[in-house]
Amino acid sequence: KNKCQLPSDVGKGKASFTRYFYNEESGKCETFIYGGMGGNSNNFLTKEACCRECAQGSC
């Protein structure tokens, strides 16, 4: 699977980082809370990075 098709994944850890993931259903980059370790590659620090990688102009 392409990383943009993966679901958001909180991962492991006790941190609460706000990150962005591409939601294939809505076609948008949305926020989720990341635990700080693990997870998957559909995890971006900024909305801009998510849009550039996955949303192809829909942001």
UniProtKB/Swiss-Prot annotation:
<keyword id="KW-0872">Ion channel impairing toxin</keyword>
<protein>
    <recommendedName>
        <fullName>Kunitz-type serine protease inhibitor LmKTT-1c</fullName>
    </recommendedName>
</protein>
<dbReference type="GO" id="GO:0004867">
    <property type="term" value="F:serine-type endopeptidase inhibitor activity"/>
</dbReference>
<keyword id="KW-0800">Toxin</keyword>
<feature type="domain" description="BPTI/Kunitz inhibitor">
    <location>
        <begin position="4"/>
        <end position="54"/>
    </location>
</feature>
<keyword id="KW-1015">Disulfide bond</keyword>
<dbReference type="GO" id="GO:0005615">
    <property type="term" value="C:extracellular space"/>
</dbReference>
<dbReference type="Pfam" id="PF00014">
    <property type="entry name" value="Kunitz_BPTI"/>
</dbReference>
<keyword id="KW-0646">Protease inhibitor</keyword>
<keyword id="KW-0722">Serine protease inhibitor</keyword>
<dbReference type="InterPro" id="IPR036880">
    <property type="entry name" value="Kunitz_BPTI_sf"/>
</dbReference>
<dbReference type="GO" id="GO:0090729">
    <property type="term" value="F:toxin activity"/>
</dbReference>
<dbReference type="GO" id="GO:0044562">
    <property type="term" value="P:envenomation resulting in negative regulation of voltage-gated potassium channel activity in another organism"/>
</dbReference>
<keyword id="KW-1220">Voltage-gated potassium channel impairing toxin</keyword>
<dbReference type="GO" id="GO:0005576">
    <property type="term" value="C:extracellular region"/>
</dbReference>
<feature type="site" description="Interacts directly with the S1 pocket of trypsin">
    <location>
        <position position="14"/>
    </location>
</feature>
<dbReference type="GO" id="GO:0015459">
    <property type="term" value="F:potassium channel regulator activity"/>
</dbReference>
<dbReference type="GO" id="GO:0033644">
    <property type="term" value="C:host cell membrane"/>
</dbReference>
<keyword id="KW-0632">Potassium channel impairing toxin</keyword>
<feature type="disulfide bond">
    <location>
        <begin position="29"/>
        <end position="50"/>
    </location>
</feature>
<keyword id="KW-0964">Secreted</keyword>
<comment type="similarity">
    <text>Belongs to the venom Kunitz-type family. Scorpion delta-Ktx subfamily. Delta-Ktx 2 sub-subfamily.</text>
</comment>
<dbReference type="InterPro" id="IPR002223">
    <property type="entry name" value="Kunitz_BPTI"/>
</dbReference>
<comment type="function">
    <text>Serine protease inhibitor that inhibits trypsin at a molar ratio of 1:1 (Ki=124 nM).</text>
</comment>
<dbReference type="InterPro" id="IPR050098">
    <property type="entry name" value="TFPI/VKTCI-like"/>
</dbReference>
<feature type="disulfide bond">
    <location>
        <begin position="4"/>
        <end position="54"/>
    </location>
</feature>
<feature type="disulfide bond">
    <location>
        <begin position="51"/>
        <end position="59"/>
    </location>
</feature>
